């Protein structure tokens, strides 16, 4: 697919100014030059043109916000001064698999003060003696060359600055704080529920104790009644009858007869 058609397809009815990332890998460029890309892509931060048969980047438009440029597996041999003029805020540049042969070709990159990472894998320049030392000396602003720093420490898999993860991290941290607040509220709710459950348990325990006390009192009263009945059973028949009448508020007929005799 031609680069111009691919560019139209990638836009997907968006305006160029709305695009922040653009991938044009493996399409065909006309005469080895960039086609269709303009300064209307004013908010573009990431541009990838891998294996598009580029010979020159002279047609690269002014892209002030561009931070990461992927140009690997092309046939670029020079003309890098265009980058300093049109992509002044570039932080990552990948020129792997191009025709870069000597250190002097990289000299224009000195004018990119924010250049943080440079990749030159499979370029002839990497075969030069003291290649790494020479590049770090020429470009002191570099942190990583071909994925490693000057002390041979490997670069992290992703760089928050280049990938635009800084804002995402802040957003995630904000969400994390909200989640922590939610967790604290949940914990407080659980504590309140536990306290209410404990109060309910205490009330139930008190009610059970009251029930036990009432049962014991009833049993004691029943026991007293039974003792009274047993005592009554032990009385002689006449006295028992008399006692029952007294309890009922009546007089014994025999007593009445005695009164009459008197």
Curated annotation (Swiss-Prot):
Protein's UniProt keywords contain Nucleus: yes
PROSITE patterns listed in its UniProt record: LRR (PS51450)
Region (Disordered): 150-262
Gene Ontology BP terms: regulation of apoptotic process
Keywords per UniProt: Chaperone, Leucine-rich repeat, Nucleus, Repeat
Primary subcellular site in the record, as a coarse category: nucleus
Domain of life: Eukaryota
SUPFAM superfamilies per UniProt: L domain-like
Per-repeat ranges for LRR: 16-40, 43-64, 65-87, 89-110
Family stated for the protein in its record: Belongs to the ANP32 family.
Designated name of the protein: Acidic leucine-rich nuclear phosphoprotein 32 family member B
Lineage of the organism: Eukaryota, Metazoa, Chordata, Craniata, Vertebrata
């Amino acid at each position: 697919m031609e680069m111009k058609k691919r560019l139209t397809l990638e836009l997907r009815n968006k305006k160029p100014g709305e695009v922040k990332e653009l991938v044009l890998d493996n399409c065909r460029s006309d005469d080895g030059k960039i086609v269709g890309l303009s300064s209307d892509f004013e908010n573009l931060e990431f541009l990838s043109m891998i294996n598009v048969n580029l010979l020159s980047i002279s047609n690269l438009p002014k892209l002030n916000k561009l931070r990461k440029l992927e140009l690997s597996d092309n046939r670029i041999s020079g003309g890098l001064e265009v980058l300093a003029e049109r992509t002044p805020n570039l932080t990552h540049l990948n020129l792997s698999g191009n025709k870069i042969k000597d250190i002097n070709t990289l000299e224009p990159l000195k004018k990119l003060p924010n250049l943080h990472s440079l990749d030159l894998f499979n370029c002839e320049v990497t075969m030069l003696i003291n290649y790494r030392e020479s590049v770090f000396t020429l470009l002191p602003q570099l942190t990583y060359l071909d994925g490693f720093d000057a002390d041979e420490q490997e670069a992290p898999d992703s760089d928050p600055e280049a990938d635009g993860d800084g804002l995402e991290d802040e957003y995630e941290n904000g969400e994390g704080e909200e989640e922590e607040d939610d967790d604290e509220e949940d914990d407080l709710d659980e504590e309140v529920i536990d306290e209410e459950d404990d109060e309910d348990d205490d009330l139930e325990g008190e009610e059970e104790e009251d029930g036990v006390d009432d049962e014991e009192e009833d049993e004691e009263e029943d026991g007293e009644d039974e003792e009274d009945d047993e005592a009554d059973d032990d009385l002689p028949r006449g006295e028992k009858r008399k006692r029952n009448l007294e309890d009922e508020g009546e007089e014994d007929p025999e007593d009445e007869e005695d009164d009459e005799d008197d």
